[in-house]
A protein has these predicted regions:
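Conserved C-terminal active-site "lid" loop/helix of NAD(P)H-dependent oxidoreductases
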Residues: 181-187, 202-247
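SDR active-site strand-loop-helix element
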Residues: 10, 33-34, 67-73, 77, ...
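Adenosine-cofactor binding site in Rossmann-like domains, unifying the SAM/SAH pocket
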Residues: 3-23
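NAD(P)-dependent short-chain dehydrogenase/reductase
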Residues: 105-149, 155-156
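Mid/C-terminal beta-alpha module of Rossmann-like enzyme folds, strongest
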Residues: 160, 166-211
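Structural motif
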Residues: 28-29, 66, 228
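NAD(P)H-binding glycine-rich loop region in Rossmannoid oxidoreductase-like domains
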Residues: 9, 21-52
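Catalytic helix-loop patch of NAD(P)-dependent Rossmann-fold dehydrogenases
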Residues: 44, 51-56, 75-114, 118-119
């Protein structure tokens, strides 16, 4: 559907999405990954989070070209107790979740809304890199065991997004196969990386974080044609291989 002869990556220095677009060559397709992702910070500054996640998305949509908008499992409250599908009604618990949900609306009709969850990769700030650092520094880490989701490797998600361009606009749930708690995920990271570090399982209330998180936010798709991602554990192995190759 789209000829990717040229891919242009824009940083915040090129375009702060809270402002209208600067002069650009009109693209065929925009992958809109710019977002406020500080879940707890959004509780303290919901207006700034909305400026990025809602206003910024509206500015990107104003280009008038097809758009891929990356959303989140945090648009759900976790009360369903079984995997969320595209037809389920969102009910976010946090300011972050609300801004991402409003951003879905701001993306407009010519968009693919890609809801994914617990993203991790070899670069940037994410759970895998944090656990690798803490595991190297400590003999024990405390990790919540009462939140369940689908850890999703960004490399697998990127491959799936390319396939979405052949599918109809709308909401798509694209997350790794399988699910686990954060504590399960931490133990898998240490096991795969060969790190001797004990995981102490705790409840969310012990962390006393400003933003509420859904206790169960596993995503599944009921839409035909949705790209199927590998199991989250396979994604973890790919991520660790990339990290090892970079050193």
């Amino acid at each position: 559907m789209f000829a990717a002869d040229r891919v242009v990556g824009l940083t915040r220095a090129d375009w702060d999405v809270t402002r209208p677009a600067p002069p650009l060559d009109t693209p065929e397709l925009v992958l809109h990954a710019a977002a406020w992702t500080d879940v707890d910070g959004a509780e303290a500054d919901p207006q700034e989070a909305a400026a990025v996640n809602v206003g910024g998305t509206a500015n990107v949509a104003a280009l008038g070209v097809p758009l891929v908008y990356f959303s989140t499992d945090y648009v759900f409250d976790g009360s369903k107790g079984e995997p969320y599908v595209e037809a389920d009604a969102p009910s976010p618990l946090s300011a972050y979740g609300r801004t991402k949900l409003h951003g879905e609306a701001a993306a407009g009709d010519r968009s693919w809304i890609v809801r994914s969850s617990w993203l991790f990769g070899p670069t940037g700030h994410n759970f895998v890199r944090t656990m690798l650092r803490l595991g190297a520094e400590r003999g024990e880490v405390a990790v919540v065991d009462d939140q369940r989701g689908c850890p999703t490797y960004v490399g697998h998600l990127a491959e799936a997004v390319l396939a979405l361009a052949e599918l109809p606009y709308g909401v798509w749930h694209v997350a790794a196969e399988g699910d686990c708690t954060w504590a399960d995920f931490a133990e898998a990271i240490f096991e795969e990386a060969g790190i001797r570090c004990r995981v102490r399982r705790i409840g969310s209330e012990e962390l006393q974080r400003p933003a509420r998180r859904p206790a169960y936010s596993v995503l599944r798709s009921e839409r035909p044609g949705v790209p199927r991602l590998p199991h989250w554990r396979e994604g973890l192995r790919h991520c660790l291989e990339r990290l090892e190759a970079a050193h």
